[in-house]
Amino acid sequence: MLTEYTAPGESVEVGDDESIYSLLTGRIARTGEDTVIAERKTAPGQWMKVITGEFHKDVIAAAKGLIAFGIAKGNAVTIFSTTRYEWGVLDFALAAIGAVNVPIYDTDSAAQAERILNDSDVKLAIADNRERFDRLDSVIDRCPSLKHILMLDSNAMGALEGLGVTVSDEELEARIDSVHADDLATIVYTSGSTGAPKGAELSHRNFISITRAGSLALHEIILEDHPRLLLFLPLAHCFARFIQYASIASDDGVVGYLPDTKTLLPDLRSFEPTYLLGVPRVFEKVYNAASRKAGMGWKGRLFLKAAEAARDWSHMQQAGEKPTMKQTAEHLSYEASVYRTVRGALGPRIRYVACGGAPLDVSLAHFFNGIGLPMIQGYGMTETAAPFAANRVTDNVIGTVGQPAPGSSVRISDDGELQVKGPNVFRGYHNLPEKTAEAFTEDGWLKTGDLASIDDEGRITITGRKKDIIITAGGKNVSPIPMEQEIVKCPIVEHAVVVGDNRPFIGALVTLDLEGLAAWLPSVGLSADTPLDRIATVAAVHDEIQKYVDKANATVSRAESVRKFVVLDTQFTQENKCLTPSLKVVRPAVNRVFAQVIDQQLYSGKR
């Protein structure tokens, strides 16, 4: 095992005068304006092609409109929307004029949006629909810098185009020329260990470097054989921003923008992507849907046997072994009866799936690999403009997250933490110099907070998390502390521990406060000496705690909210290692001691 590794090859070149907008103009310079660059859904099963020239025209119109709106270089503009064509256009328009894109997740609450708007001094916010417009409008009086809110569903793009006619081509060109690679391009907010959101400042160079390096490392997926990407991850996530840029920057890549994932499976069939980018939960749902469709009878038994055979086939491939004639015949049989159908659910032209944003179940990766659909796992974080390392198509070692991009470096600290260095590493947290200093070592390496190992070929294996931040199976970063603090305000609660790492939703374990119970129980007709194991099952107890869970949930998005909690009939103590001598909760110990409760009562039946 290695303690430090630098990927061979030079870091990709990024000119000092380049911007994210240059990715688009570079494509036009190479291939002209007549190649299809995007598709937007117009009706069920119907997609409208957008050629590069039309996309560029829309970007220019939006850029001029933003200038006319008074957006100066360095001003912050928020996009509060699901993934849609206009999001992509606005992203490139903001980059072109040197404005700072401050995205807000479409699921964020009004309170979360307010914190982001004020911390980054947003001048203009653009929401997609009435619901999100109203969330912004409800806090505008408490956001001094926010002057205007536009709504895409009320023709915001048309309004920008109309305003932009007053801006000359020369004025626009002067703005474009004023933007440089090291200028701030975006502030992306991510949960911190204290619960307060931290705005990661990412430059144009950060994104351009990883876009080019990632495209070269994954050229079979992103650059070759007429690549088609259906983009449904939120563009507020750096992972999605990166892959959008990679598709736009390729010679003939096509990105389809999907605003609503409720119709994902039929949209996959009609759009026909060649590759997909998703978080583990997406592919878990595909697997679970196939399993449910097979049912409980003989078809269900066939699916389970085929799934196990696929994993065995993948393990055999990974070990470099050759199948026997019997194994080959079995594989061909399952290919005809099961594997082809599962792959077809992702579209008839699918060739690869890329996965990141949260830890991936190795058995799931082996399943997809075994059915002939290589799953490429990567690793990154907001602070690295999403991807930092990825498996290669020709070196896809399941269980690892691959090697870093060419010219980038990784190392393992004395306490096992993965630390990284490269041109896509962010410059710091907005308005938080102390947090920025804490994020880096004295010699300039970014501390990831993840525990890892590096093999002799430079492949990284993530072995755990050093920090408390929870990453759900859907890739959402959740800080548990603010939620826990709200729940323990309940007078009958002693401790609350939020869980959900690599799980489909956020849950919580709750212990009861004996003194608080003694005072409260008579109010619901129970004796103060009622046994704890009975109290834990009383509906009135759950109802009382639910009030505080609801209060906690009101401050966060649905993806971060506690969907289910379990009242324990025991307490955290120093004896069971769940409390320190200073009576602090030991989170890993709680997860270990109550693992069966978490698995069977919180997440029973869930993958």
What would you call each of these model-derived segments?
Residues 208-228, 235-339, 349:
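Conserved AMP-binding/adenylation subdomain of ANL enzymes
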Residues 69, 96-162, 544:
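Structural core segment of the AMP-binding/adenylate-forming
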Residues 404-472:
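Conserved ATP-binding/catalytic segment of the ANL
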Residues 44, 131-181, 290-341:
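ANL superfamily adenylate-forming
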Residues 75, 108-138, 210-230, 261-275, ...:
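Conserved ATP-dependent adenylate/AMP-binding module captured primarily in the ANL superfamily
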Residues 49-53, 185-211:
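Conserved AMP-binding A3 loop
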Residues 16, 37-92, 109-114, 161-164, ...:
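Conserved AMP-binding/adenylate-forming core of the ANL superfamily
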Residues 33-35, 151, 165-189, 196, ...:
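Conserved pre-ATP/AMP-binding loop-to-beta segment of ANL
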